[in-house]
């Protein structure tokens, strides 16, 4: 597929939108301008409807969404996005900048929900095969910092309303997975904004230049 799929990950309030802007600015400075943006869940008509179902606390009334149903909806949205948007773009040499991908499911559902990690890995491999982002920027914040920022933005979705314990488990799984995969780079997002932006620029620049070497 080529090395041009970059994903930004992190807890709520980690600063993914700002990070995306920095990534775009950095790529443009490196002469890369042909890019598209995606978000998960979402990014297609079907995936956006699934996003509403899984995140909008009012979407199914009083019905409780089970953990496994939640996982399957995330994967349904992801597969639709990957097959109809991301892969075709990559095949044409377009850079794809994604707000979340499969690492979110491994962290939120595997860590936060406590769903069996072997089952999640098996499901991922079955529906995505060996498709992975070329570079993932994981913005690491504590739940206390991240949720304070998220709550300042206004209404929280169904997952953003989870407990601190849920987000602590999610963060722990993020860190565990990041330590295992060299394609995942951890950025300390508790730093002042200028320092976070500097780290993102340096990471992306070094990575792009390394791909071209």
Swiss-Prot record:
Residues engaged in binding ATP: 10-17
EC nos: 2.7.4.9
Reaction(s) catalysed by this chain's protein: dTMP + ATP = dTDP + ADP
Keywords: ATP-binding, Kinase, Nucleotide biosynthesis, Nucleotide-binding, Transferase
Entry-linked SUPFAM superfamilies: P-loop containing nucleoside triphosphate hydrolases (SSF52540)
Any one Gene Ontology molecular-function term assigned to this protein's record: dTMP kinase activity
Coiled-coil regions listed: none
Any one GO biological process: dUDP biosynthetic process
InterPro entries tied to this protein: P-loop_NTPase, Thymidylate_kin-like_dom, Thymidylate_kin_CS, Thymidylate_kinase
A Pfam family: Thymidylate_kin
PANTHER family with a match to the protein in the record: THYMIDYLATE KINASE (PTHR10344), UMP-CMP KINASE 2, MITOCHONDRIAL (PTHR10344:SF4)
Family of this protein: Belongs to the thymidylate kinase family.
Biological role: Phosphorylation of dTMP to form dTDP in both de novo and salvage pathways of dTTP synthesis.
Name under which the protein is recorded: Thymidylate kinase
């Amino acid at each position: 597929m080529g090395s041009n799929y970059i994903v930004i990950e992190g807890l709520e309030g980690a600063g993914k939108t700002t990070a995306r802007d920095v990534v775009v600015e950095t790529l443009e400075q490196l002469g890369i301008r042909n890019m598209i943006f995606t978000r998960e869940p979402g990014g297609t008509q079907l995936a956006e409807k699934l996003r509403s179902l899984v995140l909008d606390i009012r979407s199914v009334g009083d019905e409780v969404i089970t953990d496994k149903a939640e996982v399957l909806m995330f994967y349904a949205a992801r597969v639709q996005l990957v097959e109809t948007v991301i892969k075709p773009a990559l095949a044409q040499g377009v850079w794809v900048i994604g707000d979340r991908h499969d690492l979110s499911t491994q962290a939120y559902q595997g860590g936060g929900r406590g769903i069996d990690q072997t089952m999640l890995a098996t499901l991922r491999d079955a529906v995505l095969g060996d498709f992975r982002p070329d570079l993932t920027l994981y913005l690491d914040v504590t739940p206390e910092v991240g949720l304070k920022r998220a709550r300042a933005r206004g209404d929280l979705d169904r997952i953003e309303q989870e407990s601190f314990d849920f987000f602590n488990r999610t963060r722990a799984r993020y860190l565990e997975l990041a330590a295992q995969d060299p394609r995942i780079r951890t950025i300390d997002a508790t730093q002042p904004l200028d320092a976070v932006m500097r780290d993102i620029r340096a990471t992306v620049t070094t990575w792009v230049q390394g791909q071209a070497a």
